[in-house]
Amino acid sequence: MSEKDLNFSLIHTPDGQTRPDEQADKKFSFTNLSKEFDDHIDRSIRGYSTLRTDVVSLSRYFVENDTTVLDLGCSQGSLIRRMYENNDHVRSTKYIGVELNDSFQEHWKEEEELKYIVDDITTMEFPKNLSLVTSLFTFQFIPERKRVPLMEKIYDNLIEGGAFVFSEKLLSIGGKVQNMMEFMYYDYKREHFTEKEILDKEIELRHLAKLTNEDLLIKQLLGVGFRQIQTFWRNFNFVGMVALKIPSNNWDKK
C-alpha cells in the first residue's frame, strides 16, 4: 500500500488519533449513508448539533394547539421527533416528517401524532393548518425553478403567526470571501474525513446541490409574503434563518 493509499484509508478522529476508514471503498450517496446520516452531518457541518437544538427551542414559540408541524427532508426523522417530544405544552398537534429517499424508513418510529411519509415536497399537497415548517439543508437540492413555488406553498399553508425555520449552505457575494470560506471549511472537513471521502462527496454533490446567495434568498422569501426574516445561526457559509408569516396590518413599516 502506497503512502497515498494509506492517507485515503485512515481517518483522523477529534482526539488526534487515526482509525481505519470503513467507508473508503464506498462512493458517497445519501442512500449509502442512511444508517449513519445524522452522525455524518454532525461531522460535516460544524455546529450542526447546536443548530438542531436551536430549531427545537424555536419551535416552542410557534407550535400551537390543533395545528400541524412539517419537517421537509426529514432523513432519519430525529428533528421532527425532538420537536414532538419537546412541545408537550400543546394539544392535538400533528407532526409530519417528509422524505423523498425511502432508505431512511427503517429509522422512523411513529406515534399517534407523529407520522412519516415518503413523498416529493415539490408536488405533494401540504396540510392547510401549519404552525411551523422546518427544512434543514434541503432547498439546495431542489431544482431552482421549483424553489419559489415551494416557498409559496409553505407560506400559503402556514397560519398567521406561523414560521418557516430552515438552514442552507449559501454562496458568498464576493469571490474572495467565497474562496476563504471554502478553504476554511475544507480544513475543517479534513479533521473528520479522508481526502477520498471529501473528494467523492464533492463530485457527487456538484451535480445535485445548486447554491444561492443570501440576498437572493431573502428577496424570494419576501416576494412570496414572508416578513421579519432573521438569521439565528451561522457557521462558515451555512446559515439558519426564520421567516414569519404575519398579518399585513402588523408589518413593520420601518
Task: Name each model-derived stretch.
Residues 169-220:
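C-terminal alpha-helical "lid/dimerization" subdomain adjacent to the S-adenosyl-L-methionine
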Residues 47-65:
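Conserved alpha-helix/loop element of class I SAM-dependent methyltransferases that forms part
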Residues 161-169:
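Conserved beta-strand signature within the Rossmann-like core of class I S-adenosyl-L-methionine
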Residues 1-36:
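N-terminal, positively charged/glycine-rich alpha-helical extensions of SAM-dependent methyltransferases
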Residues 148-160:
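A short glycine-rich, Lys/Arg-flanked "PGG" loop and its adjoining helix->strand segment in the class I
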Residues 134:
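A conserved beta-strand element that flanks and buttresses the S-adenosyl-L-methionine
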Residues 70, 75-123:
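Class I SAM-dependent methyltransferase SAM/SAH-binding core
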